């Protein structure tokens, strides 16, 4: 049984987050005598055992007033989500079903601790920071669309009319990019020449992508697109990235269509907290909204 670990004092909070590493950490901020906190406690405990790949912590806002203040806790129960000590989301209230859906959402496509060896110390897999609703892919096939390349399974993204793809990836907060993983098949359909653009004010078309100067151009080898391949980026050029546009010009074997099995970015958020994502709740202390 994994269980929920109480955080006894303010100095204990950051070490607990550090210990979670790249795993999802779900932190419940609670208060003694808070009715909604008591109601959701059994479900929260059950989730901690149901999802052992995540770390579950509990913080009493009276025992850890500094931690509560730093994280702008204004009502209980409030649940904050962290990865690599970076706050990535929050959930408020005692709806166990809604909380579990949020947990499952963040565990979907979890990079997992088994990939830590591939990621340099101080960086993280940025998949949790990709805003899927803000992503776009031109020339994707109907049968093998863009969402497939964000999952580590047997599905894949495939181009439609020819070998080219134009992919825009949006992040839910500014990030710094260090490298990326770009996986493809070994049958000649894997991507080869790729132009990378960042922070475009509007979507570009294929003609614009052809003639525009990229932030960085890549010539991928067959080794680069293997499962353990990592493609370095010019880190100084990717310091404050809100979106990335990838123009896949060609594939390894001059095949009719291009396939991408999976891709993700390695880097760090620019800031530890994206306050625009979190609405401060005005209410009395201990009041749930």
Curated annotation (Swiss-Prot):
Domain Thioredoxin, residue spans: 2-109
Gene3D superfamilies named in the record: Glutaredoxin (3.40.30.10), PITH domain (2.60.120.470)
Primary residence: cytoplasm
Protein localization: Cytoplasm; Nucleus
Record's keyword terms, sorted: Cytoplasm, Disulfide bond, Electron transport, Nucleus, Phosphoprotein, Proteasome, Redox-active center, Transport
Keyword DNA damage among record annotations: no
Disulfide topology: 34-37
Domain PITH intervals: 115-285
InterPro entries documented for this protein: Galactose-bd-like_sf (IPR008979), PITH_dom (IPR010400), PITH_dom_sf (IPR037047), Thioredoxin-like_sf (IPR036249), Thioredoxin_CS (IPR017937), Thioredoxin_domain (IPR013766)
Gene Ontology terms for molecular function: disulfide oxidoreductase activity
Pfam families: PITH (PF06201), Thioredoxin (PF00085)
Gene Ontology cellular component annotations, sorted alphabetically: cytosol; nucleus; proteasome complex
In-chain residues carrying the UniProt-annotated modification Phosphoserine: 113
Functional description taken from the UniProt entry: Active thioredoxin with a redox potential of about -250 mV.
Assembly and binders: Component of the 19S regulatory cap of the 26S proteasome. Interacts with PSMD14/RPN11. Interacts with, and reduces EEF1A1.
PANTHER family in the cross-refs: THIOREDOXIN-LIKE PROTEIN 1 (PTHR46115)
Protein name according to UniProt: Thioredoxin-like protein 1
